[in-house]
């Protein structure tokens, strides 16, 4: 484990859950006792060697960690420039990084005596991971999913139902991830006695952004060790896609105090930053949503704007509060990739490396296609391949068929 130093980028949040002006806990009065209970339970679990040992055992024997650090030789040759490595978190059980966080939260729920688990999901990967761990531990599971996402992510809906979860399509608002999170929060308020809300990203009220980051930091901790083994030194740059930003925070956090490591987060630019998109840093401003202050997409009246991305997992009008702080602190550079750029990267990676990525990390690959050729050959670049693309093949196939007909 890497440890934070004084004046560190890794020392947040403070005791009230703030990263600078971001974060906090803006919740209904009925939820505050739960939030405080959760914070205490997490602090106790974090300090308990038995909890950590049990989690590490499940990571090894159930999740399949550590995930490999893979040299993408053909992509490197194709692009010229930087030597590109993939952190292969799509090889985890359930097919994405989401299981890292869900394992920790479900273990915490059991420790707190909660038998009913609720979750929100966009692409369905967090929902699948939650349904999987609930099946493993014999817990009731309800997953809220925007009706639009239910349509475009049918394979994951079927997986969740197969695993015994109840999937609730959300018909309000734009019927995507924000609306699913709203419904999950409503459920939690009315079922506080027996229900644990398993949030899927580094958002929500404190302690969620910190807790999810800590559970996901296994990605960056492994990468440090693996890169030293492979190259004898740290990487020169890191690249990861960002919706709420948990896969990115998991990779970035252990490297924040290494000034030699450049860090790039990639938001979803959708149809373009002047049109419909989901790039909260590039096109948003600070506000409050889902229990925390962060950068959000808002209209001129301060109402939350609708986000758009080809990728259901990035289709969220906000970003984790720690990302907002890292942006303002200028430690991380935030870029954005359009739907079309992500589609091109999805196809390129499938054909060059025999790896079909999820549309979410395809956004990160799209920016690697721009960044890598500008770097010298000795530059070591690590990309978090945070999800596999099985869930997206029907959607991408349909888009490509339509385009072929039109051309």
Swiss-Prot record:
- Which residues are recorded as modified (N6-(pyridoxal phosphate)lysine)? 98
Q: Which cofactor does it need?
A: pyridoxal 5'-phosphate
Instruction: List the GO terms this entry assigns under cellular component, sorted alphabetically.
Output: cytoplasm
Pathway info: Amino-acid biosynthesis; L-tryptophan biosynthesis; L-tryptophan from chorismate: step 5/5
GO function term, MF aspect, one = tryptophan synthase activity
Q: What is the lineage of its organism?
A: Bacteria, Pseudomonadati, Pseudomonadota, Alphaproteobacteria, Hyphomicrobiales
Q: Which family does it belong to?
A: Belongs to the TrpB family.
Concerning PROSITE patterns, the annotation shows:
TRP_SYNTHASE_BETA (PS00168)
**Signal peptide (residue range):** none
Query: What keywords are annotated for this sequence in UniProt?
Result: Amino-acid biosynthesis, Aromatic amino acid biosynthesis, Lyase, Pyridoxal phosphate, Tryptophan biosynthesis
Q: What Pfam families does this protein map onto?
A: PALP
Query: Which organism's genome codes for this protein?
Result: Bradyrhizobium sp. (strain BTAi1 / ATCC BAA-1182)
Q: What is its EC number?
A: 4.2.1.20
Q: Which reaction does it catalyse?
A: (1S,2R)-1-C-(indol-3-yl)glycerol 3-phosphate + L-serine = D-glyceraldehyde 3-phosphate + L-tryptophan + H2O
Recorded hits in InterPro entries, A to Z, give: Trp_synth_b_CS (IPR006653), Trp_synth_beta (IPR006654), Trp_synth_beta/beta-like (IPR023026), TrpB-like_PALP (IPR001926), TrpB-like_PALP_sf (IPR036052)
Summarizing the function annotation, the protein's role is: The beta subunit is responsible for the synthesis of L-tryptophan from indole and L-serine.
Instruction: Report the domain of life of the source organism.
Output: Bacteria
Protein's name in the database: Tryptophan synthase beta chain
Quaternary assembly:
Tetramer of two alpha and two beta chains.
């Amino acid at each position: 484990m890497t440890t934070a130093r004084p004046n560190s980028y890794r020392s947040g949040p403070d005791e009230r859950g703030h990263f600078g002006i971001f974060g906090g806990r803006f919740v209904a009065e009925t939820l505050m006792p739960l939030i405080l209970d959760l914070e205490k339970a997490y602090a106790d679990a974090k300090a308990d060697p038995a909890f950590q040992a049990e989690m590490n055992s499940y990571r090894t024997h159930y999740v399949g960690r550590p995930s490999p650090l893979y040299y993408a030789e053909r992509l490197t040759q194709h692009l010229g420039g930087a030597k590109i490595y993939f952190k292969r978190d799509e090889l985890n059980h359930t097919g994405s990084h989401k299981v890292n966080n869900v394992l920790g939260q479900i273990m915490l729920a059991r420790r707190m005596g909660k038998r009913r688990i609720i979750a929100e999901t966009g692409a369905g990967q967090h929902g699948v991971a939650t349904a999987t761990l609930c099946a493993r531990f014999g817990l009731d599971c309800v997953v809220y999913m925007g009706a639009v996402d239910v349509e475009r992510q049918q394979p994951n809906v079927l997986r969740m139902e197969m695993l015994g979860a109840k999937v609730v399509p959300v018909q309000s608002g734009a019927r995507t991830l924000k609306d699913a999170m709203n419904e999950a929060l409503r459920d939690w308020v009315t079922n506080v006695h027996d229900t644990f809300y398993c949030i899927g990203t580094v958002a929500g009220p404190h302690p969620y952004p910190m807790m999810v980051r800590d559970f996901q930091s296994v990605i960056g901790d492994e990468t440090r060790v693996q890169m030293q083994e492979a190259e004898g030194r740290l990487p020169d740059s890191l690249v990861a896609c960002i919706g709420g930003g948990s896969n990115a925070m998991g990779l970035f956090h252990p490297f924040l105090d290494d000034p030699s490591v450049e860090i790039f987060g990639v938001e979803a630019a959708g149809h373009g930053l002047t049109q419909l998109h989901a790039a909260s840093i590039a096109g948003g401003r600070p506000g409050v949503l889902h229990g925390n202050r962060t950068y959000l997409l808002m209209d001129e009246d301060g109402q939350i704007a609708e986000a758009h991305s080809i990728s259901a997992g990035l289709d969220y009008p906000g970003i984790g509060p720690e990302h907002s702080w890292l942006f303002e602190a200028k430690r991380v550079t935030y870029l954005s990739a359009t739907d079309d750029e992500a589609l091109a990267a999805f196809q390129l990676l499938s054909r060059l490396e025999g790896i079909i990525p999820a549309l979410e990390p395809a956004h990160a690959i799209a920016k690697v296609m721009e960044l890598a050729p500008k770097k010298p050959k000795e530059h070591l670049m690590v990309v978090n391949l945070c999800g596999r693309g099985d869930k997206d093949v029907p959607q991408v196939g349909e888009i490509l068929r339509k385009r072929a007909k039109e051309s």
